[in-house]
Structure formats: C-alpha cells, structure tokens
C-alpha cells in the first residue's frame, strides 16, 4: 500500500513502541526528523517495524464531525519509493467521533492536539506524558473493536501496542 493512498485526507498519529525515544530527546540526541511532504520530494516519513499508525479524519467544512477511524501497523520500510510494508488496515467500530473524544475537556470541545491548524507539512509534536497516557488509555479502553478492512494491508495480525508508547503526530 502506498503511503499517499493510506493517508489521503487523514492526519496520522504514530504510536511509537520504543520508550527509549524519550531518553534520546532528553539527551539532545534526537532533535527533529527530516519529514518532507512526499508530493514535493521523494522523502517519506521514517516509521519503524511495529509502529502503530492511528488515522484521524479532521473536521472539514463539508464533512461530518471528525473521527479516529483506522489503525494500521508498520511492517517494514520498502527499498523503493513506494513507502512502507503495512499490516492489515483495521477499521475502528464504531469510529471514535467528536462526542466520544471529550475525555480531556470539560468545555465539550475536542482536545487541543486534535484542533491544530493544518499547515500541509510534516511536523513533529511530542505529547506530554499526561496527554499521551490519557489519549492511549481512552483509545484502548473505549469499547472499540477492530475489524480488518477488506482488501487493505497484508497479514491478519497487527503489532501489539506497548505498555510505554510514545505518540508523535504528523500533520498532513
């Protein structure tokens, strides 16, 4: 599956399973990633084996309320420019819509991390530990079932989400 076919008009949240990423950032070894828009260059986002991508559909003027609707696991980076070998694409049933994403706001609005302006470039954003834990706890415990979407992805198993994941958002 090509990266552009996967993303379309979604925003992508990467659940990185390697907690050592925090140590790299704190030590200054990891400052930023060179993530350029694929339509401008041949460079692609750098995902690793076992990374879990959460696909979030932002609110658009002529579209229904936003939702977090799909989960896919990264198998490997391909040697060509086609992107990544991905596991099966799971549809979240039901999708997590606006009314189910009020877990961090008493005012009845979406969490700020979901409302940022889309500047049409890749950016790296690290959530705070509290945001990360709250977000993952909600997503994984919101009585959401995962169903394989026919014709998408590869094998029938997905990489499990780690106990201490790091979430990084890539805005498209």
Where are these regions (language model features)?
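Aromatic- and Lys/Arg-enriched surface recognition patch
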Residues: 65-144
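Sparse, context-dependent recognition of short Cys/His-centered cofactor- or disulfide-binding micro-motifs
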Residues: 32, 38, 53, 57-59, ...
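Short coil-to-beta transition motif at edge beta-strands of beta-rich domains
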Residues: 43-61
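Short, solvent-exposed loop/turn segments at secondary-structure junctions
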Residues: 19-22, 60-61, 79
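Charge-dense, helix-prone N-terminal extensions
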Residues: 56, 61, 73, 83-99, ...
């Amino acid at each position: 599956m090509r990266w552009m076919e996967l993303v379309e008009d979604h925003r992508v949240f990467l659940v990185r399973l390697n907690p050592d990423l925090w140590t790299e950032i704190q030590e200054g070894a990891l400052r930023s990633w060179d993530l350029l828009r694929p339509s401008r260059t041949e460079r692609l986002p750098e995902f690793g084996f076992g990374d879990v991508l959460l696909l979030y559909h932002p609110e658009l003027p002529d579209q229904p309320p936003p939702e977090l609707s799909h989960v896919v696991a990264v198998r490997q980076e391909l040697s060509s420019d086609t992107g990544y070998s991905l596991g099966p694409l799971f549809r979240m049933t039901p999708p997590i819509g606006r009314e189910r994403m009020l877990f961090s706001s008493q005012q009845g609005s979406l969490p700020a991390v979901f409302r940022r302006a889309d500047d049409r470039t890749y950016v790296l954003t690290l959530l705070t530990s509290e945001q990360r834990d709250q977000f993952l706890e909600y997503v994984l415990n919101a009585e959401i079932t995962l169903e394989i979407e026919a014709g998408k992805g590869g094998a029938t198993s997905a990489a499990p989400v780690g106990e201490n994941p790091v979430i990084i958002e890539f805005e498209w």
